[in-house]
C-alpha cells in the first residue's frame, strides 16, 4: 500500500510540473521576446515599428492610442477582437492567417512551447498606468 501511495504521489508531482510548463515559462518567454524587441517594447508605453506590448493580454486588438495600425488590424479591433491567450497564440503562430492584411512583418514562431513561454511572459507585464 505504501508503494502504491509513493507511486501515485510521484505521478501527481510529474503531472503538476507538466501542466505548469504547458502554460509556459515566463523566464524563457522573456528571452524569446528578443525576437520581438526589434519592433516592440514591453517595458515602456512607447511605440517603435510596432505598438508597445505592455498589458497586451486582455487588450482589444488595434487599441494603442499612439500607434498607426494597418487597416486590417483596425478592422479586427473594431469587430471586437481582444488579445486573449488563444488569439495571441494564433497570431504568434501565423500573423497573416489570423489578421489577413496585417502589416506585421513577422512570419510566426516555430514552436508551441516558445509561444506558450512568450505568452506567459507577456501576462506578467501590466498595462501602463
Question: What is the role of each PLM region?
Answer:
Residues 1-11:
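Bacterial N-terminal signal peptides that target proteins for export
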Residues 16-33, 129:
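Electrostatic cytochrome c docking/interface patches
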Residues 26-34, 46-54:
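Sequence context surrounding c-type heme c attachment/ligation sites in exported
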Residues 29, 33-42, 118:
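The canonical Cys-X-X-Cys-His
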Residues 40-46, 58-59, 93:
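Detector for the c-type heme attachment site
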Residues 56, 60-63, 95-99:
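A short secondary-structure junction motif
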Residues 65-82:
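Short Fe-S-cluster ligation motifs
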Residues 82-129:
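C-terminal capping alpha-helices of c-type cytochrome domains
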Amino acid at each position: 500500500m505504501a508503494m502504491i501511495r509513493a507511486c501515485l504521489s510521484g505521478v501527481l508531482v510529474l503531472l503538476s510540473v507538466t501542466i505548469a510548463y504547458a502554460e509556459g515559462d515566463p523566464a524563457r518567454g522573456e528571452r524569446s521576446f528578443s525576437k520581438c524587441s526589434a519592433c516592440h517594447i514591453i517595458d515602456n508605453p512607447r511605440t517603435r515599428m510596432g505598438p508597445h506590448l505592455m498589458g497586451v493580454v486582455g487588450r482589444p486588438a488595434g487599441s494603442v492610442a499612439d500607434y498607426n495600425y494597418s487597416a486590417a488590424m483596425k478592422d479586427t479591433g473594431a469587430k471586437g477582437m481582444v488579445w486573449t491567450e488563444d488569439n495571441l497564440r494564433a497570431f504568434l503562430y501565423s500573423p497573416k492567417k489570423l489578421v489577413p492584411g496585417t502589416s506585421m512583418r513577422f512570419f510566426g514562431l516555430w514552436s508551441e512551447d516558445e509561444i506558450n513561454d512568450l505568452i506567459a511572459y507577456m501576462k506578467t507585464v501590466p498595462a501602463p498606468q
